[in-house]
């Protein structure tokens, strides 16, 4: 779509930037100069760091229900987390899967109340089962696919899909020493007075 407006698309991975003066310098496989820069690097899903989690990534472990949920139609799955992301993933999957186990390490959810209410309705319907004060210890399976999970309590649950929903990390590491940030997210002007997406450096914007 962008190409129809004359945008030139270059496939490269930028791993170094210099924003100290204009033109800004970007380095990847090649070097690029720009008087203005729009940062739209997105965020990456956070994982628990378990060896078994990485072993089955893409083979039963996922961090995106809308991407991979259809593979588990009428199957039993679990969602790890208790915030908005976990609640949204669990609700989405509850309309596809036979049952969703929501694994949360605390005794109450952190999600917005409207999402919690929907979760509890699905729980009454038997579509979602909440495991309070529980943490994922290990993803179980054979050499190719997930067959279940083990919790820190010792309980094992047979299922075929594990969805990790514990938050995201913004992809902003290369800007950390050059732009103002909060919790890894680039801060912008905001407001209605123009240049709402401008960062702490003039000519650098974040979306």
Question: Locations of the language-model features?
Answer:
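Glycine-rich Rossmann-fold phosphate-binding loop(s) that bind the pyrophosphate
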Residues: 81-83
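N-terminal Rossmann-like NAD(P) cofactor-binding module of classical short-chain dehydrogenase/reductase
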Residues: 38-39, 163
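Generic hydrophobic/aromatic pocket-lining and core-packing "Φ" positions
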Residues: 90-91
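Phosphate-coordination loops involved in phosphoryl transfer and adenosine-cofactor binding
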Residues: 11, 73-75, 133, 201
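Residues at the starts of beta-strands that form the adenosine-phosphate
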Residues: 76, 98-102, 203
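A Rossmann-like FAD-binding core segment of flavoenzymes
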Residues: 2-4, 8-26, 31-32, 95-191
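FAD-site-proximal beta/loop scaffold in flavoenzymes
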Residues: 44, 49, 55-71, 166-207
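N-terminal Rossmann-fold NAD(P) dinucleotide-binding loop
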Residues: 86-87
């Amino acid at each position: 779509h962008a190409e129809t407006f004359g945008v030139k698309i270059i496939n490269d991975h930028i791993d170094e930037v210099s924003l100290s003066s204009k033109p800004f310098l970007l380095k990847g496989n090649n070097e690029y100069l720009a008087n203005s820069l729009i940062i739209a690097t997105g965020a990456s899903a956070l994982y628990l760091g378990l060896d078994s989690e990485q072993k089955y990534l893409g083979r039963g472990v996922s961090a995106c229900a809308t991407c991979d949920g259809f593979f588990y139609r009428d199957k039993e799955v679990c969602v790890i987390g208790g915030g908005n992301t976990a609640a949204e993933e669990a609700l989405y999957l509850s309309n596809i899967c036979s049952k969703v186990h929501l694994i949360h390490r605390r005794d109450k959810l952190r999600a917005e109340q409207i999402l919690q209410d929907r979760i509890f309705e699905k729980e009454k319907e038997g579509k979602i089962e909440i495991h309070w004060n529980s943490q994922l210890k290990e993803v179980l399976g054979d050499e190719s696919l997930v067959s279940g999970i083990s919790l820190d309590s010792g309980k094992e649950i047979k299922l075929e899909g594990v969805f990790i929903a514990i938050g995201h990390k913004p992809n902003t590491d290369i800007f950390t020493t050059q732009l103002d940030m909060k919790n890894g997210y680039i801060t912008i002007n905001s407001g209605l007075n123009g240049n709402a997406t401008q960062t702490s450096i003039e000519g650098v914007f974040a979306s």
